[in-house]
């Protein structure tokens, strides 16, 4: 009697089992994984729209404002002193006060070299920082998608209604290793990506339309 009840359930034969060794399929949707994939796609889409260079520049500005930098402080001091020395040199006659003018000129030259050296150090630091941010963006977007595809390649995000789609479509949606009749992580990533693109396109179109309406109403001539 128990065997008859079990036969009414749905079964799958895992790889490596012999004939007759079946386990029931868990058709409960993987809600956590479903939301995680959707969040990763949304996050990647936001990063893509903002642009990596803009994010790098913004974070660099934040870091330089929050974290004290001796190089930035010294450059500012050198720049202020260079302006002061340049003004004094301009107001000093190179013929009547040559000694003073020459001293100011030497100091101004040293300050220019110092500022250039500091700029080179800051440029190198900025390049290293940009490389770190670029790597972090890659790992948290493309890298995360690759990890989800590999780690959960056999997971079923959710199950399709039985016999709702022909075999070729079910095969594509379960690619590469998810059970047939389910939606795999790879397929769900592509579905979410396409959906996000559509949502963003519609949103941008609506915003542009609203802005256009507001502008047209603003410039519309008043009738007497």
Swiss-Prot record:
Bilayer topology: Multi-pass membrane protein
GO CC terms of this entry: endoplasmic reticulum membrane; GET complex; Golgi membrane
UniProt keyword annotation of Methyltransferase present: no
Family annotation (InterPro entries): Get1, Get1_fungi, Helix_hairpin_bin_sf
Residues exposed to the Cytoplasmic side: 54-137, 200-224
Molecular functions per Gene Ontology: protein-membrane adaptor activity
Residues annotated as transmembrane: 34-53, 138-158, 183-199
Record topological domains on the Lumenal side: 1-33, 159-182
Protein localization: Endoplasmic reticulum membrane; Golgi apparatus membrane
Main location: endoplasmic reticulum
One Pfam family here: CHD5
UniProt keyword annotations, A-Z: Coiled coil, Endoplasmic reticulum, ER-Golgi transport, Golgi apparatus, Membrane, Transmembrane, Transmembrane helix, Transport
Coiled coil: 102-124
Keyword Endoplasmic reticulum: yes
Domain of life per record: Eukaryota
Biological processes per GO annotation: tail-anchored membrane protein insertion into ER membrane; vesicle-mediated transport
Subunit record text: Component of the Golgi to ER traffic (GET) complex, which is composed of GET1, GET2 and GET3. Within the complex, GET1 and GET2 form a heterotetramer which is stabilized by phosphatidylinositol binding and which binds to the GET3 homodimer.
Family of this protein: Belongs to the WRB/GET1 family.
Function text: Required for the post-translational delivery of tail-anchored (TA) proteins to the endoplasmic reticulum. Together with GET2, acts as a membrane receptor for soluble GET3, which recognizes and selectively binds the transmembrane domain of TA proteins in the cytosol. The GET complex cooperates with the HDEL receptor ERD2 to mediate the ATP-dependent retrieval of resident ER proteins that contain a C-terminal H-D-E-L retention signal from the Golgi to the ER.
Record-given protein name: Golgi to ER traffic protein 1
Native source species: Yarrowia lipolytica (strain CLIB 122 / E 150)
């Amino acid at each position: 009697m128990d065997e008859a009840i079990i036969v009414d359930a749905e079964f799958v034969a895992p790889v490596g089992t012999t004939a007759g060794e079946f386990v029931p399929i868990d058709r409960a949707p993987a809600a956590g994984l479903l939301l995680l994939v959707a969040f990763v796609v949304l996050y990647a889409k936001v990063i893509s729209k903002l642009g990596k260079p803009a994010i790098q520049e913004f974070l660099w500005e934040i870091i330089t404002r929050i974290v004290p930098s001796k190089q930035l402080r010294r450059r500012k001091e050198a720049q202020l002193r260079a302006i002061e020395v340049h003004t004094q040199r301009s107001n000093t006659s190179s013929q009547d006060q040559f000694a003073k003018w020459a001293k100011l000129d030497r100091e101004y030259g040293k300050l220019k070299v110092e500022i250039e050296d500091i700029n080179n150090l800051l440029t190198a630091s900025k390049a290293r920082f940009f490389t770190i941010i670029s790597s972090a963006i890659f790992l948290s977007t493309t890298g995360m998608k690759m990890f989800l595809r590999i780690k959960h390649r056999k997971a079923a995000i959710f199950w399709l209604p039985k016999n709702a789609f022909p075999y070729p479509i079910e095969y594509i949606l379960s690619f590469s290793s998810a059970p047939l009749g389910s939606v795999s992580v790879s397929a769900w990533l592509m579905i979410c990506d396409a959906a996000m693109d559509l949502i963003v396109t519609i949103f941008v179109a609506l915003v542009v339309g609203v802005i256009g309406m507001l502008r047209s109403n603003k410039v519309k001539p008043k009738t007497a």
